[in-house]
Amino acid sequence: MSKLQNITLSAVTIILAACSETVITPPEAPALDINFEKFTLENGLDVIFHVDRSDPVVAIDIAAHVGSGREVTGRTGFAHLFEHLLFLDSENLGYGGLDEMNTRIGGEGTNGFTTNDMTQYFQAVPKDGLEKIIWAEADKLGWFINTVSQDVVDNEKQVVKNEKRQRVDNQPYGHNLYIVSKALYPEGHPYNWQVIGSLADLDAAGLQDVKDFYAKWYVPNNVTVTISGDFDTAQAKSMVEKYFGEIPRGDDIPPYEAQPARLTESLNLYHEDNFATVPQLSLTWPAVEQYHPDAYALDILISYLTEGKTAPLNEVMIDEDKVTSGVSGFNYTKEIAGELYLFVSPNEGQDIDGLMPSLNKAFERFEENGISQDDLDRIKAGIEVDFYGDVQSALGKAIQLGEYNVFTGDPGFYKKDIANIQAVSTDDVMRVYNEYIKDKPSIAVSFMPKGQRELALDGADKAKVVEEVVVAGEGAAPDFNPAARVLSTTTPSKFDRSIEPEFGATYELPVSDVWRDTLANGIEVYGIQSNETPLINFSLRIDAGRELGSVQKPAIAAMTADLLEKGTAQKTTAELENAIKSLGSSISISNGDTGTFISGTTLKRNFGQTIDLVKEMLNEPRWDAEEFSLLKSKILQDITQSEGNPNAISARENAKLNYPENHIFHYTRYGPKDKLETVTLEDLKKFHSLYYRAQNAKFRIVGDFTKNNVISAMKDMFPEKTHPIKEKAKLPAAKEITTSKIYFYDVPEAKQSVLRIERPSLTSTDPDFPLAEAINFPLGGIYTSKLNSTLRVEKGYTYGIRSGFNGDIDRGTFNVRSSVRTNVTKESIELIRDIVGNYGPDFTQEELDIMKGALLKGQALKNETLSDKLRMLGEISAYNYPADYRAQNAKAIEAMTLQDFKSLAEKYLRPNAMNYLVVGDAASQMDGLKSLGFGDPVLLNGAE
């Protein structure tokens, strides 16, 4: 994608015509106000400051102009491996010190990512931690390399390989981008390989590779530091100069020149996928690099072709020809080249060849009709409104300003970016279609289930994919003890860097003023006013969750919500979509366990018109039989597709283990296919009539609104209904777990085992719930948790592991979840059991004090964005919490004693009374689990 889709703005002026006419006046040039100051240190380090005093938060972003494209053949994946290493250690922070410090001072964790062209590292903390994070990030950049040993490199290789297994090797269609990059770019081209690299190349990486990469690329003159938030610029400049200024400049790095891909003929490839249950076709065309003049028109082109009811590909392939249930695509722009992608899967029982006549028909229709000015302006308006989401946090601004500086040398390049998107014309869209897609060579890749080669596109050649074979004993963690490391060499400094800076000045934690009211029609309204941007976020919660559905037809509640998006009595689906988008608004309807949620985002001036559309959707559904049929077909296709996804399998089987067959939650959202087939349109109408009413509704709103406007808009949200409200039936109890049992779902040749360890636990309204969440924080709630520190950092078994309490009004669970390397399945479960079991007894007063400090200081980051505020209102309204519930919870946590902690852990953490669910390769792993002491594992799909 062009960077336009990711930039951040403080203000965008969009002038739209009235909703009823659904005609859009082209947006005027945006009025932007992202204040920033840029300066460069003598060593070449670019520094950007952005001051935002709306919240007591500061964020820092370190952007290095190096990604996988700077790697050499035989060392693919190295830039990403280096990203992992840089987080681990530095001379003055110590091993794991960066994450430990972030947690201790109230941050929400450090993070980063690597692309083909850059690597970014970032964190946000309360404002009094500014000097601490500047000190820490400088220590990473300048005082890192002496801490790296071959043991450190070898251990982190295992983590990265687990990430590859989780994201690529153990997922349906996971190898698609690998196949395309190998086919599209010649050997030696920087984009011939994926960012994650190959397992063989990762294995080959050594300590000298780390040193060479660091010396060449991680130098001040190739790095941008961006600081955003509530801080004093003069003080911050002094800090940056002190901590970063003495890092030596590196060699000059020449700029990258564009190297676009060239295809002289189309390529047709296939891959039999171990995890695919339905075929998929991807089509890829060579395109252009980021900021190329044509990149903006290509963004709009792919959006118009694939998004929405009137999109030409959807209109023909889904609605008319019914050969697929979904089409997607994106324009992937990178620094020196780009690709245009299209993805489509045939409906069940069809092959990929059957897609092509319909696809060609859709393209021909587009060639005939083109794109209208209204459609063009509507897409532009939607892109612009999306920008606001990125400016609500200090961290989002830091990341984007740094990224612009890396690639253009100008943090303010967003002005040019916006101007470029505004300049795209309908002729431009047609021109880039003709130049890059029509009759142009492409790469077709067919994926199909193993053993079903006949489903591929006719004439396809087998793609070369290197599949990992996980062998028992291979990939074992080295004898690794990071605490024992001794530095033989240190990097000199003009001052003692081992002393962590003190906290800055104290600050007042802002408290949101929560407005609440009950309207005459019974709707409860909750609001928080915020005028940082001219945006409003809202959510209407209706007590119409899937708990009210039928065991015989579990999908009724979810399908009702889905179908309400498919038109109204006055508007077809296409007309409704156009009416919403013409306002620059978004409206979505989703269904959860206990409620249905109508969520939206709108510009302040269009709030009334947007709410009018919400009313129309809720009160005057179209109940279109054709749309119902299409919806059911899509859900059936999605269920089939999920049957090969290990994570989806885990969720489905876990529901069965937790609840009896006569409980609605025994099933996932739509239930099994045979039950879905029986759902009728009349079922949805009846559910809507029974439960969609004012007495069941709570409205939450945050942003730049007035109370009078909200009250006026909501007064006739629901029509009067004469029949009484149907009482919620009492659901059966969840299955009781008194002893642990292991359940295994076999996915032959799985590269990882998906673990889900769970038991029933607290409801969200239980007085102990916030305290239980607190005690889980050091166990599995953060990167530095005991579970993650052991299984990922120390052992290299997983890319990540989390634990947590999840609750609603009537039920709750405690679970531990992870994906681990196949050949350490037993060892991972053993560690989890022991860590959870010993957690309470071994917990110390020092650890308790750190936990309290982290949770209490972290409150500063909990109320920064509109989404944060809306989430808080959601909890207040759903669970009848007091407006100051967070402050009350903080007091309870502060008062917790060590004995309180241990008692809570003993009561709620019970590793010997949990279901242990494993989704993985039974042939190699199941027998080994017998020695864990939980009896013989139960094979869940043994008859299949």
Identify the role of each PLM range.
Residues 1-20:
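Gram-negative bacterial Sec-dependent N-terminal signal peptides
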Residues 19-47, 232-273, 280, 314-315, ...:
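Proteolytic maturation boundary segments
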Residues 50, 55-71, 77-81, 96-143, ...:
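M16 family metallopeptidases and their MPP-like homologs
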Residues 138-148, 243-251, 360-371, 617-623, ...:
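A common structural junction motif
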